[in-house]
């Protein structure tokens, strides 16, 4: 808008309408679900996005498989970014230096750090809570001093509630929400690590891993899968595919489902999966 570019809003995501609109656009901003739907349409090819300069994604992690399929189909890459209502965009991949599975480096003027449960800063490669600091960070929540106290430090850092790690170059990789972390038998399990492996299995469209109450372990790992037509998987198949992961991370049960429940922003609503407010098969 600052450069005088036209912004076109569509009333809803309909694949054919979006493909038609791409012909007169240069930038597309979407969530991973949108890219998956575009790739499912035979009309989406290099010619359909010939005028495009930039594709960006946010709000939810994009699988490495979707990244690879998009590049193979179009010859372009999707630039993943990281932001939130409290601070706008904080980090981004560079258009000439995209790493699938990462949301890139902090933008100029912003800082990102990873801390443990005691608030101590962790080293590169260690997983913990993502904290951010920068000029666009909001001053606080409206009439919510309790929320401010829980999320802000005295020196200006904001606790995002996201779990992630920084590599040796300070590139950020997200593992999920701290509220999504599963504690089973006293061990911390990050669902994204399991989902990334499951999503690579032939015939799996997408997956979601959640924890549900378990009398012995506190929480049991449960997997929900969306499968291609005619494909079936059972727990034994899943165990074989997940052989690279520690045994305690393997799902105790799995359910196939027509589609993962999502909100308007395309984020998977794992709370509905935890409380069985879906129709697993």
Which functions belong to the PLM regions below?
Residues 5-24, 189-197:
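ATP-dependent adenylate-forming carboxylate-activation enzymes
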Residues 2-5, 22-30, 39-100, 111, ...:
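Gly/Ser/Thr-rich phosphate-binding loop
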Residues 105-109, 120-151, 187-189:
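Conserved ATP/PPi-binding loop(s) of AMP-dependent carboxylate-activating enzymes
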Residues 59, 83, 104, 162, ...:
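Active-site glycine-centered loops adjacent to acidic/histidine catalytic or metal-binding residues
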Residues 79-85, 104-106, 210-213, 255:
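Beta-strand->loop->alpha-helix junctions that form or flank phosphate-binding loops
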Residues 31, 134, 139-140, 155, ...:
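AMP-binding/adenylate-forming catalytic core of the ANL superfamily
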């Amino acid at each position: 808008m600052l450069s005088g570019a036209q912004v076109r809003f569509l009333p809803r995501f309909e694949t054919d309408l979006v493909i038609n609109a791409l012909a007169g656009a240069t930038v597309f901003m979407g969530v991973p679900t949108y890219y998956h739907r575009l790739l499912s349409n035979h009309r989406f090819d290099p010619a359909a996005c010939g005028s495009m300069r930039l594709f960006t994604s946010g709000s939810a992690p994009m699988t490495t498989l979707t990244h690879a399929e998009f590049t193979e189909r179009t010859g372009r890459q999707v630039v993943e970014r990281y932001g939130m209502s409290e601070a706008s965009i904080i980090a981004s991949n560079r258009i000439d230096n995209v790493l699938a599975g990462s949301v890139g480096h902090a933008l100029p003027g912003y800082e990102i750090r990873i801390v443990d449960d005691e608030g101590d800063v962790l080293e590169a490669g260690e997983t913990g809570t993502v904290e951010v600091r920068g000029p666009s960070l909001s001053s606080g929540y409206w009439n919510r001093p309790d929320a401010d106290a829980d999320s802000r430090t005295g020196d200006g850092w904001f606790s995002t509630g996201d779990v992630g790690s920084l590599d040796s170059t300070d590139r950020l990789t997200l593992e999920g929400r701290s509220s999504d972390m599963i504690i089973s038998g006293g061990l911390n399990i990050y669902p994204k690590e399991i989902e990334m492996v499951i999503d690579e299995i032939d015939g799996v469209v997408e997956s979601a891993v959640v924890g549900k109450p378990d009398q012995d372990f506190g929480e049991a790992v449960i997997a929900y899968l969306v499968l291609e037509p005619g494909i079936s998987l059972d727990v034994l198949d899943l165990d074989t595919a997940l052989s690279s992961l520690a045994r305690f991370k393997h799902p105790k049960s799995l359910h196939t489902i027509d589609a993962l429940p999502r909100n308007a922003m395309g984020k998977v609503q794992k709370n509905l999966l935890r409380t069985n407010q879906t129709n697993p098969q």
